[in-house]
Curated annotation (Swiss-Prot):
<keyword id="KW-0030">Aminoacyl-tRNA synthetase</keyword>
<dbReference type="GO" id="GO:0003723">
    <property type="term" value="F:RNA binding"/>
</dbReference>
<dbReference type="InterPro" id="IPR002307">
    <property type="entry name" value="Tyr-tRNA-ligase"/>
</dbReference>
<dbReference type="InterPro" id="IPR002305">
    <property type="entry name" value="aa-tRNA-synth_Ic"/>
</dbReference>
<dbReference type="GO" id="GO:0005524">
    <property type="term" value="F:ATP binding"/>
</dbReference>
<dbReference type="InterPro" id="IPR036986">
    <property type="entry name" value="S4_RNA-bd_sf"/>
</dbReference>
<dbReference type="Pfam" id="PF00579">
    <property type="entry name" value="tRNA-synt_1b"/>
</dbReference>
<keyword id="KW-0547">Nucleotide-binding</keyword>
<keyword id="KW-0436">Ligase</keyword>
<dbReference type="GO" id="GO:0006437">
    <property type="term" value="P:tyrosyl-tRNA aminoacylation"/>
</dbReference>
<dbReference type="InterPro" id="IPR024088">
    <property type="entry name" value="Tyr-tRNA-ligase_bac-type"/>
</dbReference>
<feature type="short sequence motif" description="'HIGH' region">
    <location>
        <begin position="42"/>
        <end position="51"/>
    </location>
</feature>
<feature type="domain" description="S4 RNA-binding">
    <location>
        <begin position="334"/>
        <end position="394"/>
    </location>
</feature>
<keyword id="KW-0694">RNA-binding</keyword>
<feature type="short sequence motif" description="'KMSKS' region">
    <location>
        <begin position="226"/>
        <end position="230"/>
    </location>
</feature>
<dbReference type="GO" id="GO:0004831">
    <property type="term" value="F:tyrosine-tRNA ligase activity"/>
</dbReference>
<dbReference type="InterPro" id="IPR001412">
    <property type="entry name" value="aa-tRNA-synth_I_CS"/>
</dbReference>
Amino acid sequence: MTNINTVLAELKRGTDEILSEADLIEKLKENRPLKVKLGADPTAPDIHLGHTVVLNKLRQFQQLGHEVYFLIGDFTGMVGDPSGKNATRPPLSREDVLRNAETYKEQIYKILDPQKTKIVFNSEWLSKLGTEGMIRLASNYTVARMLERDDFKKRFGNNQPIAIHEFIYPLLQGYDSVALDADVELGGTDQKFNLLVGRELQKSAGKKPQVAITLPLLVGLDGEKKMSKSLGNYIGVTEAPSDMFGKVMSISDELMWDWYNLLSFRPLSEIAQLKSEVEKGKNPRDVKILLAKELIARFHNEEAANAAEQEFINRFQKGAMPDEMPEFTFSGEIGLATLLKEAGLVPSTSEAIRSAQQGGVKINGEKVDNVKDNAPKGTNVYQVGKRKFARVTVE
């Protein structure tokens, strides 16, 4: 039992809920490899740090000798998961789903052991359900129970439409657990309802219900909302080391500890020691550097992490410009705000104006207050914020 307690404590780290812990203990007592499932709909080509919170937990199960299944929702991705949405998510085409799925496989192996990871596609069984199977599946749940779900309840209360296929989605995800005979399913806190549907469907099928483990959603770079590509507050696992380093260094000191708890593999005692040192006067920047290097070493290598640190020091602490930066050439007159947008330094001309008003736009190191004028002729280095540079020639 002591060993089980040790394993349980390790598995509980960073989790939000385990439903139920007693069931997990019973499964661990069986002393067999558990089937642990994590599903993801390939709705976008990139995996970001927010996704890795649950991937890290899957890796932990893998290291403990359990069977891990990374389920790619090539079928459910065409339906669209309504979790956490205040409007109907537009379904993707099969071509989009399959293209994104290919990049997923490459990226998850930055975290999971490819030799011990079973990748499955839920179209293998969901596409065979047919009309009769779908009706039988739908008979397991009532509309009233579906409306207990927070996002559906809010939309219903606000007279916002809920499409029938959105009610079907949790049932399809739950059926994945029946098809795989999963012992454990992982997901973010926004997936709790779907994970519990899996438990119910397994019971209806005469199987032992899976343990549902939810993990917190990682707050993005803005320090307010969950990390999301659509919000632009994310760090992709395939981003260049220098970009990853700069973005990690940009987060607030308060958010840093949340990231340490959810992303770092350091022992909790070591994280607590770092926090104590900061409280006693250690510069939080130095602790943030440790986190940035740990993440870059994980997704690239230690050499890249050290190089990114040195570049960061040269660029920001010594005021140096990077040796390499994107280069652009424009012919004829072009507005400065338009140039910044076309060079990828800002998402819009309005953002260029806002950045300039805040003192964040520079040409050759000199601040520019008005970006409504035309850009100067010749070759110049344009900078927005601390990390974005471009060498631009206006002919």
